[in-house]
Amino acid sequence: MGAFRRRSYGASRSPQNRRRRTPREERAMEPSHEKYDRLIARCKSIPPTPTAVVHPCDESSLRGAIDAARVGLITPILVGPTARIREVAAKARLDITKFRIVDAGYSQDSAAKAVELVRNAEAEALMKGSLHTDELMGAVVKRETGLRTSRRISHCFVMDVPGHPDPLIITDAAVNITPSLKDKVDIVQNAIDLAHDLGTAEVRVAILSAMETVNPDVPSTLEAAALCKMADRGQITGALVDGPLALDNAISPEAAKIKKIDSPVAGRANVLVVPDLEAGNMLAKSLTFLAGADAAGIVLGARVPIILTSRADSLTARLASCAVATLVAEARRASTARAVR
């Protein structure tokens, strides 16, 4: 008789045939979101930030506010149709009895009343609920009744990227579609100020393009060069700024070395400024869905930080967004206190 051969009734366990885990699965196996955990831990010594939660009329947005309150990051003020908010809470078995509710008839009314709470010093942050971002921002940017400042409003993602040692700020991937050079000055400065509020000791800003050399045929390289010169002349402050840089030599020391780019930013950037919204949105979503990153979103340049979350966000990303807003609000309180002295 021939040698007995074991039959295999299941999938082969060889490395070649083993199913590769997705980035999300790899991410789930990590013990914690260490970078986000550090941000949340920094908020433990800070009082919860009074936050107007705008139109939390679905389970996702209402639960996000409640979770952030449970951790001690915010004190939610729920702004929207009272009956509908209570209906959502009852259906999802969420306890909202301890939270103040400001009744509003519809989503745009919710946005207007939330902004009014800020103007009346009853709230120090805004948090987007189930209304469209344009509805919320429309109320924020109104000249007479909104929350405008001298700065242009811009958006930052604070990203927790696996394998990257520190949080990575990407701007602007959500608000400014095709920003001008003038717009980008504020976009860069907003991101720098945010990095300092988050406790970054040395802020290193990479102005991204498709290449690391100035090319007259590629407008983003010209704007990058101009922004760097503006930083040299003190028109942008608080950071090392370099560009144009391609993504690889902005975040990879090896790539920067191969390209022979000698710069304190190249290969070590912790703030990435993208040419336009499309590039930024694709970069952030690529990191999220291909590399297992999480993204905490915040809008800056208004009187108060504005928390933007997505229904697809993880619990940790939602909490991180609230932690970022709390740290920004605390930095503004400290700045105001210093100015009064």
Regions found by a protein language model. Name each.
Residues R13-A28:
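Short, Lys/Arg-enriched N-terminal segments with co-localized hydrophobic residues
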Residues M29-I77, P81-R341:
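Anion-binding alpha/beta catalytic cores of soluble intermediary-metabolism enzymes, centered on
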